[in-house]
Amino acid sequence: MSAYVSTRRVGAFASSRVAPQDDFSVLSQQLGQGFFVLSRKNAIEKILTKEEKIMAEEKKIPYKIYLEEDEMPKAWYNVRADMKNKPAPLLNPGTHQPMTAEELEGVFCADLVAQELDNENPYIEIPQEIRDFYKMYRPSPLVRAYCLEEKLQTPAKIYYKFEGNNTSGSHKLNSAIAQAYYAKKQGLKGVTTETGAGQWGTALSMACSYFGLDCKVFMVKCSYEQKPFRREVMRVYGASVTPSPSMETEIGKKINAEHPGTTGSLGCAISEAVEVAVKNPGYRYVLGSVLNQVLLHQSVIGLETKAALDKYNIKPDIIIGCAGGGSNLGGLISPFMGEKLRGEADYRIIAVEPASCPSFTRGKFAYDFCDTGMVCPLAKMYTLGSDFIPSANHAGGLRYHGMSPVLSQLYDDGLMEAVSVEQTKVFEAAEQFARVEGILPAPESSHAIRAAIDEALKCKETGEEKTIVFGLTGTGYFDMVAYEKFHEGQMDDYIPTDEELAQYAAKLPQVNE
């Protein structure tokens, strides 16, 4: 402590600075005889101003904020209950009428259909069996990116919710275990699904292994070839893995015939998985993103994030998530969006998507098929067209032509923003993050990192001390081919032209709303 005791330090007890002398005598004189100074530390604590106490508390924020097990969410949050403008209903692809529960149950598990159609209940209880499973890897940490802040020399405070501490290496296990639980409860033999980068397929494989279910995975062909070890992890858990489009389904044969040499897409893989599910008794289709039920399960991310922030009285200014189909983004923002919808708080929410697959930023808000084969229900969403096949970029989990109907409605209502970024810029951010934070991020997650860094640098220019929270959805240890391409200068930034997108948009189904 300085020999000078400023007016700011002793508050109302001092009217001016005093001459240099012993700290204890100064404090004793100015605080009066009724105050017994035990030590230098006690004296300083007693005279801290409110501002300084806040600063002191901020210094106590740990690098990682963990919740206790008993603080984990006991119910999922259903943001649709608080939406004034509800997402448009799924439509039967043949009749263009709203899908009934009975129709949906031919494809999905019955309990999941009930969750899909529930627009009223704000909270849905998490079954105890699922909560017990969550304890294997949850709660996940909310990390203060002190090292990244220092590297950027920004006044912004950066936090990230890290979802990579489980066998799938991502957030996907949050919904996989829930969907496998309901399939087992229904007495099914097994499930089918699609996977892009492989995290969802890995998560579902593990969940099915846990509950003793058969698991058939159709993996987007470019990822199947780029990430051979990811498919081997799925096989460790007993799943069968097929590159999509394949020659095992009628849809796959048709797509291969129409697009020779295609690298596939999530839309293709969905079509194949649905075909196999409906043709085989005792099977149902489950999915890793897009639909309401998945965003519901992923709300554990946002609920934990908010609880961790509340522990330290932290209110974020900006919340950022990568966006492919919307599962991670929807889960991360859900409780914050709920507050925004109810008028209790305001946040700036940013979706980040690849420039090669810009559903939000360049797509149309319209009804479209959820799959390339046009066998799934029609959903009203931001879409590039169901037959749009993105370039073979290295963010396989974001290569989807559409977007969650929930997020699409929120975006259309002006409640969130969206930006698209080129993959070379994404990998620059990924490498910068890895070198200071010690985690090799997945390419998908790195889209959010790119936007978070950009926002932090804006704060550096303006001097604003904004609090930024982003979702680090998973790790990139199976994405080394992508990192190799980046380091060797072999990574391209393909961006579809307006003419290309117009051609796909012209093929959107005509629906009378």
Model feature map: region roles:
Residues 178-188, 202-214, 235-236, 333-343, ...:
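Alpha-helix C-terminal capping segments
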Residues 192, 200-263, 359-371, 480-488:
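Active-site-proximal loop->helix
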Residues 60-188:
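Positively charged, low-complexity intrinsically disordered leader regions
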